[in-house]
Amino acid sequence: MPFFLSYKIKSLIIGEDRAFALLSQEFSIIPGLLGEYGRKEIYRLTLNECTSDCSISFGTIFSHSDCEIKEGVYIGANCMIGKADIGKNVLIGSNVDILSGKHQHSIELVDIPIKYQKGKFKKIGIGEDTWIGNHSVIMNEIGKGCIIGAGSVVNDSIEDYSIVAGNPAKVIKKRK
């Protein structure tokens, strides 16, 4: 609870988004079972939804509190997760990035640096019973029962029960 109280105080001073980012970074580097338990508990208090039976590994950072983590979710080490709705029994490998859409940065105005241009953030849905392989980048919706091959870049929506791989990710076959 002291961490949550610290988060609430920081929220009043530096804003909720920045305070959440700092909290997520702090908890990402706590090793072992203590870290896993601590991450789960702090995210149950700060994310839109986080169930008690999820597993969030070392080095994983959430950039926004606008996330839902459903029952039975496993998130591997060193992941970066933006706005996301992660369905039941999803497996996310290590070093996976789930971006808040594929248009987080605008580039239209050449007289304004890209970092100052407003982007569009989108909550990314990941359907239940999906497995995302290591080192994948997710920028769009993934249906239920999908398998995303390691190193894939998902920039278009993926239909239910698809097996995809590559950059950009393409359907290899359907599970059903």
Where are these regions (language model features)?
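Conserved active-site beta-strand element of glycosyltransferases/polysaccharide synthases
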Residues: V164
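Flexible, glycine/small-residue-enriched loop-and-beta-strand segment within the central core
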Residues: G35-E41, T60-K70, Y74-I142, N167-P168, ...
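A transmembrane-helix-recognition feature enriched in membrane-embedded lipid enzymes
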Residues: M1-D53
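A short, glycine- and basic residue-enriched loop/turn
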Residues: D66-C67, G145, N155, Y161
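Beta-rich strand-turn-strand
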Residues: N134-I147, S152-D156
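Short conserved AdoMet
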Residues: T51, G127, G143, S157-E159
